[in-house]
């Protein structure tokens, strides 16, 4: 199991959903002989190692938490863990299709503004475009500028797209019908995504437009995990530079989050966190 955690730590290219499926598959590939002799304490330690390998990824935290919860139940934990892992993997594989189908039914728009790069957002937009003519305006999403790649992806999918500077989002909002964003994680404190997401949402609200997000339930985390990744570059000859990668948008600024279970309002989302159980093994580390 050490190898699984080490492989996860080295994975710098996969998205959160893909990481979950890869790790789940690796766990299910463990031989029956190895699985049956793993003590509960080793499963708990393994869960902690998975989280420490990717401490900002909600899908991995939820997998680790579920492994630890099953281990804490005692005898027979290995078989319960395998069944749970298989269920999570299958659910993750099906979730994007279900989210896209729900988004296509909910979003009645011909002009949509978005930002950054998200496979879930692209699937949702494809579902919308299959029902009505659609043009998408994509903020370039600095730092990183992955909005340009996303606009190219949409064009390759046959969806009309244009790119605008981030500073133009408010100026073009009067032409839009709604905004759509993805999410790296959702906690009781807000939706964490690429910086610029809140500006997009607030611009929509100021124009009386709906602000939708699309996100699988596997990204719902009872604790805030994502590091905002702020960098400061000093200079001896001129101004310093500061750059932030992620930001949190309060849940009440979003019209709804479209999940595989359909549209969830801010109050619905907060209700989802009531009664969420955290493994006691987390007490050994600083979350």
What is each residue range found by the language model?
Residues 1-85:
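Long amphipathic alpha-helical segments
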Residues 3, 14-22, 38-41, 45, ...:
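Conserved active-site and cofactor/substrate-binding residues in soluble primary-metabolism enzymes
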Residues 10-13, 111-117, 187-192:
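Short, glycine-rich nucleotide/cofactor-binding loops
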Residues 28, 32, 126-131, 201-210:
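Alpha-helix C-terminal capping segments
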Residues 45-73, 84-96, 101, 115, ...:
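Non-catalytic, soluble scaffold/interaction modules
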Residues 65-109, 113, 121, 126-179:
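Ligand-binding beta-strand-loop-alpha-helix segment within the catalytic cores
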Residues 120-122, 220-221:
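Short, active-site-adjacent cap segments at secondary-structure transitions
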Residues 139-287:
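Conserved phosphate- and dinucleotide-binding cores of soluble alpha/beta proteins
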């Amino acid at each position: 199991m050490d190898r699984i955690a080490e492989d996860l730590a080295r994975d710098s290219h996969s998205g959160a959903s893909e990481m979950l499926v890869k790790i789940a598959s690796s766990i299910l590939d463990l031989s029956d002989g190895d699985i049956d002799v793993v003590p509960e304490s080793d499963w708990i330690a393994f869960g902690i190692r998975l989280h420490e390998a990717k401490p900002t990824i909600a899908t991995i935290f939820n997998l680790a938490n579920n492994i630890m919860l099953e281990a804490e139940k005692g005898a027979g934990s290995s078989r319960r863990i395998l069944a749970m892992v298989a269920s999570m993997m299958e659910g993750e594989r099906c979730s994007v299709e279900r989210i896209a189908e729900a988004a296509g039914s909910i979003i009645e728009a011909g002009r949509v503004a978005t930002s950054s790069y998200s496979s879930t957002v692209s699937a949702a937009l494809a579902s919308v475009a299959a029902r009505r003519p659609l043009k998408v305006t994509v903020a370039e999403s600095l730092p990183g500028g992955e909005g340009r790649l996303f606009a190219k992806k949409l064009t390759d999918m046959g969806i009309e797209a244009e790119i605008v500077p981030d500073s133009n989002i408010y100026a073009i909002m009067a032409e839009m019908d709604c905004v759509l964003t993805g999410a790296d994680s959702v906690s009781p404190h807000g939706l964490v995504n690429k910086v610029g997401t809140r500006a997009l949402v607030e611009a929509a609200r100021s124009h009386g437009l709906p602000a939708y997000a699309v996100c699988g339930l596997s990204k719902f985390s009872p604790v805030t995990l994502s590091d905002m990744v702020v960098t400061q570059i000093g200079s001896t000859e001129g101004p310093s530079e500061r750059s932030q990668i992620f930001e949190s948008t309060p849940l009440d600024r979003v019209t709804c989050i479209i999940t595989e279970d359909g549209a969830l309002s801010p109050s619905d989302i907060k209700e989802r966190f009531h009664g969420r159980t955290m493994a006691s093994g987390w007490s050994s580390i600083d979350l």
